[in-house]
Amino acid sequence: LRRRQRQMCIRDRMRRRIFPILLLLACVIGGDYPQAAFAHDKAQATSCLTQFVNPRIGTGGHGHVFLGANVPFGYIQLGPTEHTRGWDWCSGYHQSDSILIGFGHQHLSGTGIGELGDVAFLPVTDAHQKKVLFHHANENVRPGYYAVKLQQPNVWVELTATKRAGFHRYTFGADVKKAQLVLDLFQGIGWDKPTDYALDEVKETAVAGHRFSTGWAKDQKNFFVAEFSQPVQVQPLDSGRWLVQVADATRPLMIKVGLSAVSIANARQNLQTEIPDWNFHQVVAQADEAWNRELAKVKVETSDSIARRIFYTAMYHSMTAPSVFSDVNGEYRGADGKVHQGDFTNYTTLSLWDTYRAAHPLMTLIHKEMLPDVASTFINIYRQQGKLPVWHLMGNETDCMVGNPGIPVLADLVLKGYVKDKEGAYEAMKQSALREDRGLGLLKKYGYLPYDKDPEMETVAKGLEYALADDCVAKVARLLGKKADAKYFAERAQSYRKYFDPKTGFMRGIGTDGKFREPFNPFSAVHRQDDYTEGNAWQYTWLVPHDVHGLVKLFGNEQKFVTKLDSLFIVTGNMGDNASPDISGLIGQYAHGNEPSHQVLYMYNYVGQPWKAARLIRQTMNEMYKDDFDGLSGNEDVGQMSAWYILSAMGLYQVEPAGGKYIIGSPIMDKATISLGDGKNFSIICKNNSSENIYVQSAKLNGKTYTKSYIMYQDMMKGGTLELQMGNQPSKWGTRGADRP
């Protein structure tokens, strides 16, 4: 196990629906522990992209990344849950720890709050055992498969998953005379606390039950069915725990578990549909196939093996969520707590304050088949709870983070043509923007959010987020011919100007008297007790992605704007003892470890200096992303941190939250080919590309000279090739006024 195992590759003939069981390599660990490993076909290596994924990236530091078995956008994230020791265990796992409390079926990835961990199994030596030691050297993980060798008890644990079901296999050592596990419905991760649980059905080879809980998501409901490959005896222990005793320890015990947020009957149907048989290796192979299919939507060429591994790991991480939140029969539990029948796939785990910036614009490039269902999810959430999602989890609105982040995502889908019910989408956006809660009433009354009237603080961050969301509403209103609405929301989108102090050149808290808050220190950050959200004035002054040219004018002219922007990457200062740990990945005061900074590097293109963006983009990719468990500069944030890398590595980034204007940066890949579907591809080719040749010298789009430092979404969707000639010195490319975004 100390040697890195060869990665699984699914042969092309499997894609032709011939699905043989791949060669099982017997790997003897301690004398008698088989390990599922698959033969690596060198001839197929180029199409086996899972071999380039390192799931451990981000499992240390502040990455908070999930480690375990799942499939793209699945409801199930089956993996180890460790004994929580603090904030860095939000996913239930951290590289620094070695104490397991169970193998749970649901985990979050990259969040700043811990949740889930539902329906856990743990092999034990006796009924009172609640923790098991393990060694990271005895783990084996790849997309869709997790395994670990435990010593006490002496058992080899293997896990895989489908969208709505988990599959376990436990192989007990020859010295194990009493094979047993604990089924734990009490334990949860972080804020999660059970409110009701029970085994509602107990049979010789199956149990079924429910687990309801509260926490970050206030009203969580999970129903489950667990089937065993051999007879077991189930005995109640203390609260929420049952002892599962295995009849024959000489045979592996397999457990199939189906989950549903609706009912036991639906959990059973999910399980029977997705894992009808007991062929563990086939499910592992199907998971690998699912990952390869999604990873292949972007094929990159590079001589840098580390960059390739970081790229495909980022792709892998970007597909943990949104998570499917409807059953195979179409039923789902809505935001109103009721069961609904849908004609679309419903989703949850919507970390929108993070993901509207890059993860969702990335989805519009590579997951177009999902977009109508994502839009339907948003519209139905609005109809069920009266507003678009803010941070939705397990069908619950958590209201976590500031602003109206559901608006940019839905507006982008409307403007890019993926929403059939445009009027319904617009109504959801408009009414979400016109509410009274979360500071919106103050915005309507004063035209901004005065710090002395909002008890929840963070008024600058809220106000800037509302302004960019209002701009998105205005764009959709304009598209639909709603002139009065377009005018109203376009004016409200300019409210960001209220927070700008021309004397200091920063966005600042402002009171009802029209005066800025004093005293003022642009470096200071007091978590949840000042005018900013997980940041300071240096970081929030640039949060005007919808109107960069308007922001430039506030500084007086382009030169003053550039001078200030240059300073961002140089200045250092004391943020104070109460700064948020999310302020990380610093280059000067630029904080790549947190989302509000993510568009800032690309602002140089707006003022005709794309070479400065290129230098900083390369620096950020090289310094903030590593092929290591501590390889992220901050929380993964449900795919946003990875999505920034994916887009930037290809040379693209959508700064404006909605509309499809992708800024051209400095691709780290020599070639990236995006599969658009319908047999069309869009390729970005970098000629003469290297670690020194980071500046675009010239460009061609489909063979014709291209001078703009941005490209529109609809132009990419036609298919074709963007060819960039790179060099080691800044050039005049993209600098003319007509060529700027």
Label every model-predicted segment.
Residues 469:
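ATP-dependent phospho-/nucleotidyl transfer catalytic cores
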Residues 39-408, 412-464, 472, 477-498, ...:
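Accessory carbohydrate-recognition regions in carbohydrate-active enzymes
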Residues 11-44:
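Bacterial Sec-dependent N-terminal signal peptides
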Residues 1-12:
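Single conserved hydrophobic/aromatic residue that forms the stacking wall/gate
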Residues 695:
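Extracellular attachment/recognition segments
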